[in-house]
């Protein structure tokens, strides 16, 4: 499909990133940090987003923060990769349109807009930026996910309608969440009212579509993008990143990535794809991988076997543990001989049942698990909990719980 190239006056060099949301469906992992700061591989999702923007030529970033905003500010500071970051606060979570309005005094001229909780290939950003020439430009993807993400009607390069809740299977083109806007979007947003507790960005885009003197363009793309809706999606994200080699650690073998400061015992085995971040210690006899992402300063005990796992920073796993399809948060102490056998499992989140999920378990931040414990498939342990030795964990454990035999 042909695209109308943008002029230097309309090609955006600034970007707004929406990173204010909590991510309720990702609990218990989001109890203490926002969804964009959850791990994708060994880096926060938001870090991957900023990398994509900068790789696409963005030199001015505006972050809209809200829930647990200090977790974002303290991690990134005022610059990232020599690009300045300006923070804007959304005090109340009133939707994506309301979030964007908080950055009205930020970018001058045309700008890009992306979600801070969705990993995108920088080539999608480049395509949207390069095609932008009027009020708005959207990345459009073809696939069955239109039911979940909102469908679009595309006539040539022009979007004629957004369909927020399409009937299943009726539409194949959907909004990928990568945008370029003129300043007109702010004027439109200010004419809209908050209804049903939120101000959706899509309402403003539809208003632009309905205006006779503006055009909303669509750019079709088949480049990689992915987000995490549920805790087990972090495993899928990690698999995709490892498969593509989208990791920071140096390559020591074809698909084995190990930071220089990591300490791998000569008798330990890494099975690719696997990434081991800085200051990790992996002891003798451990087998790590495939599809394992080990965050900085983690410790993997002797004889432990890990496969299809995301282990976040500062977490220690005791010896002789076996864990499959496990997401473990920051600062956890997991005792010796822990068993996490992997899915499938029926998982209950917010009173909704998800069947046949490939999930061994989720352990949120700062959890202590005693030796010889077992996580039944799909177990969810809230932050700050203590699980005694030998306990069999099933279902959901609330934050701060103490579970004994």
Predicted stretch roles:
Residues 112, 129, 155-247:
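Catalytic-core segments of class I nucleotidyltransferases/pyrophosphorylases
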Residues 123-148:
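Conserved donor-nucleotide/metal-binding helix-loop-beta segment in metal-dependent transferases, i.e.
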Residues 50-51, 101, 108, 121-130, ...:
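Short alpha-helix within the catalytic core of nucleotide-sugar-dependent glycosyltransferases
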Residues 2-17, 25, 38-39, 43-114:
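Conserved N-terminal catalytic core of the sugar/cofactor nucleotidyltransferase
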Residues 23-28, 147:
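Short N-terminal binding/cap micro-motifs at the start of the first secondary-structure element
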Residues 308-405:
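Glycine-rich hexapeptide-repeat left-handed beta-helix
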Residues 198, 207-297, 301, 305:
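Extended, small-residue-rich solenoid/repeat segments and analogous flexible loops
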Residues 115-119:
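The conserved acidic donor/metal-binding loop of glycosyltransferases
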């Amino acid at each position: 499909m042909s695209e109308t190239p943008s002029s230097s006056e309309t090609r955006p060099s600034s970007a707004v990133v929406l990173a204010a949301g909590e991510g309720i469906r990702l609990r218990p992992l989001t109890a203490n940090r926002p969804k964009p700061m959850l791990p994708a591989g060994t880096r926060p999702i938001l870090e991957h987003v900023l990398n994509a923007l900068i790789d696409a030529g963005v030199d001015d970033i505006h972050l809209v923060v809200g829930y647990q905003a200090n977790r974002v500010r303290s991690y990134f500071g005022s610059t990232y990769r020599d690009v300045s970051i300006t923070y804007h606060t959304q005090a109340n979570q009133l939707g994506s349109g309301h979030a964007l309005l908080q950055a009205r005094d930020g970018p001058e001229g045309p700008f890009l807009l992306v979600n801070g909780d969705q990993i995108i290939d920088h080539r999608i950003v480049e395509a949207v930026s390069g095609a932008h020439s009027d009020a708005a430009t959207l990345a459009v993807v073809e696939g069955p996910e239109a039911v979940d993400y909102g469908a679009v009607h595309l006539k040539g390069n022009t979007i004629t309608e957004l369909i927020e809740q399409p009937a299943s299977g009726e539409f194949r083109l959907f909004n990928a969440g990568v945008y370029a806007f003129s300043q007109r979007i702010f004027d439109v947003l200010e004419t809209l009212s908050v209804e049903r507790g939120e101000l959706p960005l899509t309402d403003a885009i539809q208003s632009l579509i309905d205006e006779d003197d503006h055009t909303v363009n669509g750019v079709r793309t088949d480049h990689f993008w992915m987000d995490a809706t549920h805790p087990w999606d972090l495993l899928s994200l990690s698999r995709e990143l490892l498969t593509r080699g989208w990791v920071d650690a140096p390559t020591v073998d074809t698909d084995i990535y190990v930071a220089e400061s990591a300490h791998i015992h000569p008798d330990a085995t890494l099975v690719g794809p696997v990434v081991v971040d800085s200051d990790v210690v992996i002891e003798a006899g451990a087998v790590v991988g495939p599809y394992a992402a080990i965050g900085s300063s983690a410790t993997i005990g002797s004889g432990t076997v890990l496969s299809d796992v995301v282990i976040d920073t500062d977490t220690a796993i005791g010896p002789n543990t076996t864990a499959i399809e496990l997401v473990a948060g920051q600062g956890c102490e997991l005792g010796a001989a822990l068993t996490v056998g992997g899915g499938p499992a029926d998982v209950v989140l917010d009173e909704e049942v998800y069947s046949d999920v490939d999930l061994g378990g989720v352990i949120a931040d700062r959890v202590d698990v005693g030796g010889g414990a077992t996580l039944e498939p799909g177990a969810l342990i809230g932050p700050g909990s203590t699980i005694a030795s030998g306990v069999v964990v099933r279902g959901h454990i609330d934050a701060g719980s103490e579970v004994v035999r």
